[in-house]
Amino acid sequence: MEDRIGIVVGGGAPAREGIDLARPLINNEGHLDKIGIAATRLNATIVREALSDAGVSVSGTIPNRVDEAVLLLEERPVVVMGGTTPGHTTDAVAIRFAIASGADRCIIATNVPKVFGEDPKTNPEAESHDFLTHDQLQEIVGPAEHSRAGASQIVDPVGVSEANISNMTLNVLDGRNVDLIRAAIVGGEFVGTVVRGA
């Protein structure tokens, strides 16, 4: 069987802006999450259409659930999806998709080069990590709970907990560098943080 790739697209600025716009009107975090999820699905559609136009054999629809994505991955080598349900971010969706599809690792593309012990935007002296255990990463990101719609961390705490339970390797890297993503996918030299079980 040829290699298969599942891509889970986050909401980014459109999700945060939509949530911020709605927050004065909506007090329910689950309802605000739905706004973020809609943004992830829009972004996923953009990525899916771009890949299709480039000639990539990508699934024709954006799945709503991880089990649906796994079935689509049996039909096409590339599946693109966004968020699913309130209570977690697309990091958790990506980790669940990787686990359910039997992947050997889940690549988390972020906007920093590695996992840091503290936010490098607020502490320029924060220490970066090449390797961490799931437990160490959980300590950095906090307990496995969803705190607030639109919240952003290096990796979703809910997803970290699920990766730990399933012993799913996480490769956290700077998603702004396409060459790093390519190397992580094809097994080239990895630059980022590898997270594994103890």
PLM region spans:
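C-terminal catalytic "cap/lid" subdomain
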Residues: 1-198
